[in-house]
């Protein structure tokens, strides 16, 4: 969705950098990166890091695929090392098989219901059991994709004959290798799920773990249905939707939009007639892109109800703050678009008979190869006027004194910290302009107050920074002078991004101390540099109230060095 020159300039900039630096470039319109990677690049047994939290989509093909901050990925691409703390391993043991109109989306919604959005932090989710072989690669990828909403490091399925058949259909059979757990594998935790017992589910506003059965939520009126995203935009999902819509008409009170996940999916839909069935039914076909999932278009009406096959339903993420967003499967979405109300798709009766092709259309003409080493130096990197320098910081001072510039509660997402949407995303290369939107969902005065103060602390609750891996949620607070974020607990990727930005992440040793601090209190971290380097206890002094609170920090020696150096950029310059 390009309403000005900014996105076009960004695309041109990235394209020129990729060409110069030896990187393949998937051009705009080729599809959502996770869907394209699954189809054309993913290999079982390989490790993948990507600067998007839904990189674990690759776990559906047997990859160790992890979301990370952009700086972490850039350092790894430049020859550095990517570090993670060894996670615990959770075995989700699947038995049985999905019943008609029950989908892979319902599997991960059930896992979210059990584990919650905090339950996967510091864990890898491994799927095992006889039920695994009943799931296709796209279905597995749907499940691993939304493992991000658990806060998990990643999720992974074995690589088996189902994986081999998928790769063969993509013309990549030589990329297959078997991957399975050892017979004597030991897990930290086991969750049992019988696929045969699952029913159509929905996550209610405004959190992916607020899960109920569709039949228990009831027949609420629906204003909008959006089908697509990196979670549910595969050919299999699209064929199911087309079959449900075939010969029918979308309810007059419903706006239905559909975004196939890749050019390959769109091509095949066009050739087999599925696209025509969608259009004839009244669907609005969107570009193969993230689109409405990140708030780029298709915002619901005021106080509207929108069913989406997406992965997140955070407050305001859709672009309409008072809209009610429900996360559902493509089957629930398509049937509800016809009825105009939330509908259990099992009411259709006869099961869908979807035949997947034995081979996919392979056309990689939208993947641009880099220049040869001989020609790389001749490639000019193209900048636009909206592309501004990366914010930097100085080394950590011995002590820090500043106000609690903002106090927020539990489950603050990176969408709260740095919102997305059509109004804001075009400025992601312009941190000074972007900064005016920081925390606007929570407090529209934050950016102005932070600029006026020049420095400050943020006080947060539990699971601070969950959701997207967007490093702008750390870079913009850095630009606004935030020196430390003090919380009950952090989400993994955001905590790493804060460290990379040179912002100190600290936790209350006693969670009750959170309640003792008010926004505007004058706070101090005395001798913080020495304490961090010497692994000493850190105390937060509340100058306003005359109190002290013990704080904790979970930092490796490398992370301490990064913080003290003023962030990963400074650290990398000095050490690589």
Regions found by a protein language model. Give the residues of each.
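Fe-S-dependent hydro-lyases/dehydratases of central metabolism
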Residues: 1-576
